[in-house]
Amino acid sequence: MKSTQTPSGMPIHKYRPFHEQITVDLRDRTWPARRITEAPRWCAVDLRDGNQALIDPMSPERKRIMFNLLVRMGYKEIEVGFPSASQTDFDFVRSLIEEGAIPDDVTIQVLTQAREHLIARTYESIRGAKQAIVHLYNSTSVLQREVVFRTDRQGIIDIALEGARLCKRYEETIPETDVYYEYSPESYTGTELEFAAEICNRVVEVFDPTPERKVILNLPATVEMATPNVYADSIEWMCRHLDRRDEILVSLHPHNDRGTAVAAAELGYLAGADRIEGCLFGNGERTGNVDLVALGINLFTQGIDPQIDFSDLDGIKRTAEHCNQLAVPERSPWAGDLVYTAFSGSHQDAIKKGFEAMAVDAAAQGVTVDDIPWAVPYLPVDPQDLGRSYEAVIRVNSQSGKGGVAYLLKADHSLDLPRRLQIEFSGVVQAKTDAEGGEVTSAQIWSVFQDEYLPAPLDRVEEKWGRFELTSTRTSSDMGGSVSLDVVLRDGDEVREASASGNGPIAAFLQVLADQGVEVRLLDYVEHALSASGDALAASYVELEVEGVRLWGVGIDEDSSTASLEAIVSGVNRAIRRTVREPELAAV
């Protein structure tokens, strides 16, 4: 088939491909052959990079709530602010320290530019902390050098080195605090690799780390400029060209301008990085920082401990939404309201069968489903492991099929419909969704099921159930196995007693109906208890042929025999309603 696409007419001449701006040439790359086997070191930057991007920056109270959340989740390195840039950030850092809010195993991180008065203020803010990371940065990209700073490479190196020396000097003013260092060549992705390596190596010499006290070199995609594989190539290249690699933690800080921050972080980690900075749910400047939730749960679904607790994901989301005053989108990876929801009929059917297969496998092994590998189509994670329920997994609209409808009836009402009944009832629901549009809830599906197959609920007793209603039954059997059935049957407005015999209650009741002029043939019969308890209700499903019409009936009763007779009444009444309805429709 020939493509019919045409030129867009957009001004593509204004933009240069990345490879014409920055050369990243690593033809002997090794990262594609590697696998992720353990979690990286994490640093949550919600309170700094995330907060500065908010329309309504966090109040001190919301900041404390966010900090406490990050601590509870298990983050051990948390960037808490830019204390030299605002009094609010300075006061927040001081409150954490003075109020003893920082656990001993958590290290706060503070950001500073490479200017003396800002560095001095930064050290003043962390005085008294048990330990802290001072994060020094200056911009190194070609564009920033030419447009913002109007200086050459040496001028940028001088800024970084002077900043590093000042940090070492001011460290002496807070001997009670164990200070670690991080350096970021900001706009790294727009920086020539050889220059990025040169400036990083020069800064490392000033900080003079050891294998026991490593320095963090953060290589940010301040603006995402290329595909994730290019970022990974640059990280592997840098790891090869850092002079004191065993004394360095290589950190990633991807932004999401091109929508591939998660992929960039994962590939960059494969390429040799040790650490990743990001925000919960991808908050941050422009399109956001890399999403720490997506990264962590991606690991979890591969059987790798993220070392972060996501077991109350809805609670985490609610807290983040409160603090950021931003909603997490419904389709946000792993956390959105619709992530574990299937509307498609084929998806619903596959999910239903997946749950059933896991139950069978677990029973065969004599264990619970939590003790066997998770294997449900379209659900790469068990929602319950993240604190979600199965209630919203299957939702029904006009695109749904029998699987979703059957799943909801089984999950919410313990009704395990035979396959052909699933098909029949899904058509009833489909007609409703086609007529009314939108989503049909589980409660609405149950109401439709009752209206179609069961007597009217007690609060709707004025509504007629149909032509026939079984009001009482009594059975007896003789030594030859024949069953005698006595029933009280309402037929329209008349109530009459009837009796018949057969090789069982069902055969006898079919004879009762034949005596009333209704010919019924039984095609299939299925029953099950609605629970495992001894006093459980029984559900019966019968497939009938009534006056040449094939359809199903459903009965629910404490007595399984009575349930089967009620199922026959259900099917017969449905057949009669259908024959009455069709001429009316034809007349219209």
Curated annotation (Swiss-Prot):
Compartments, record wording: Cytoplasm
GO biological process entries: L-leucine biosynthetic process
Cofactor dependence: Mg(2+)
Primary localization: cytoplasm
Positions that bind Mg(2+): D49, H253, H255, N289
Region annotation (Regulatory domain) ranges: 456-588
Gene3D superfamilies: 3.30.160.270, Aldolase class I
Subunit structure: Homodimer.
Listed NCBIfam families: leuA_yeast, PRK03739.1
The name this protein goes by in its record: 2-isopropylmalate synthase
Gene for this chain: leuA
